[in-house]
Amino acid sequence: ADVHFVGKEIVRFHTIIWPAMLMALNLPLPKQVYGHGWLLFGDGTKMSKSKGNVVDPVVLCDRYGVDAIRYFLLREIPFGADGTFTNEALINRINSDLANDLGNLLSRTTAMAQKYFGGTIPAEREEDELDQELIQMATELCAKCDAHVSGYQFSNALAEIWKLIARTNKYIDETMPWVLGKDESKRARLATVIYNLCEVLRIISILLTPFMPSTTP
């Protein structure tokens, strides 16, 4: 593998002894060795397999789902740093980010697209200044995420995605599609708003796929 991810306490072994063993066997060397941090409990105690004080990941995944656990760890803990795990923090992150922010955006958008246009958005458009900031953020997001992921800054990439999610929820409140839907003369404007919402969800789903592959399809 080009990149080896190892615990920070064994970086010396994996950057001196392990490469020497690979060279002796004429096997390819890793191009990068990245030392990740420790997972701690709320009181600062390190989780350790040898101490037998780890949280069972199978139990967590059965209860909350693999994607939710993966999201929590990558969002909550900057890669390379030590991170704290508590059940309270996990539940709060799932409820706040996944259920409230993303879940509500998805629910509201799909419901309005179905209610006003039967699930098929018409081609007519009427743009407004309210659209510009959202469009710019969505347009720039891919490059920002690519840069963060390339540097293994997964938490930063997810933070950028959630900035767009928050801005999109605000956009709904600003444009008030439920008001536009009552005025037939505003149909083109309503179509533009719903299209922008759907386009943001499309972009977000693509960028979240590496983090939540079972959820985004």
Predicted regions, residues:
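Helix-rich, typically C-terminal accessory recognition domains appended to large enzymatic cores
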Residues: 76, 89-127, 137-217
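Alpha-helical recognition segments enriched in aromatics with Gly/Pro capping
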Residues: 1-88
